[in-house]
């Protein structure tokens, strides 16, 4: 009677080893895809079109040099400027011929969503922390793909000198797809 169990024991051990090996192979592939997607998409997040509003300061920044906003503009209690000088005072629904950028919901990201001063790992951890990002992974994909203020970065108009503003280093579609791949594969963060 012990003979069948002696035959089955190595087979069961091999099956367990195969299952573990398959799991180990699958997980790193997902992790690699996620990390590769994040490594590419973070170039957009670190671009001035995003960082100027995801600032850790009490004021917005502007331009590729990320200078303090003209006219002493401040963040304000709701991230829309101060009661005396709301963002919408100058920033209308569309880019203005004068060079003032526009969007119907122009505002700063909340301080909990500030990326300024963070390295790539810190940005990733901030994005994946629902308490700080205030978004689920699904909401983050939606935000990065469809929010008109995010998409403004690819249609930034001209600056105050009449020169075209620099766009992020890839298309909005490519960025959105990278965000999807990153989240679908576990939203992994670099070490």
Describe these PLM feature segments.
Residues 46-80:
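N-terminal, post-signal-peptide region of Sec/Tat-exported proteins
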Residues 1-42, 62, 73-78, 95-191:
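N-terminal export/targeting leaders of redox proteins
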Residues 36, 48, 82-85, 174:
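Short, well-structured alpha-helical interface segments that form or flank functional binding sites
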Residues 48-57, 84-94, 179:
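The canonical Cys-X-X-Cys-His
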């Amino acid at each position: 009677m012990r003979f069948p169990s002696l035959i089955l024991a190595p087979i069961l051990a091999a099956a367990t080893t195969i299952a573990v090996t398959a799991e180990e192979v699958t997980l790193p592939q997902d992790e690699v895809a996620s990390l590769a997607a994040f490594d590419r998409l973070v170039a957009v997040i670190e671009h001035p079109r995003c960082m100027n509003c995801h600032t850790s300061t009490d004021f917005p920044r502007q331009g590729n040099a990320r200078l303090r906003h003209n006219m002493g503009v401040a963040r304000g209690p709701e991230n829309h400027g101060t009661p005396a000088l709301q963002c919408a005072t100058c920033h209308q629904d569309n880019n203005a011929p004068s060079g003032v950028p526009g969007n119907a919901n122009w505002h700063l990201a909340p301080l909990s969503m500030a990326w300024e001063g963070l390295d790539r790992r810190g940005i990733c951890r901030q994005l994946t922390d629902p308490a700080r990002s205030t978004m689920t992974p699904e909401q983050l994909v939606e935000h990065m793909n469809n929010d008109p203020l995010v998409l403004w970065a690819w249609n930034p108009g001209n600056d105050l000198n009449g020169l075209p503003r620099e766009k992020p280093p890839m298309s909005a579609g490519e960025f959105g797809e990278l965000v999807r791949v990153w989240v679908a594969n576990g939203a992994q963060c670099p070490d």
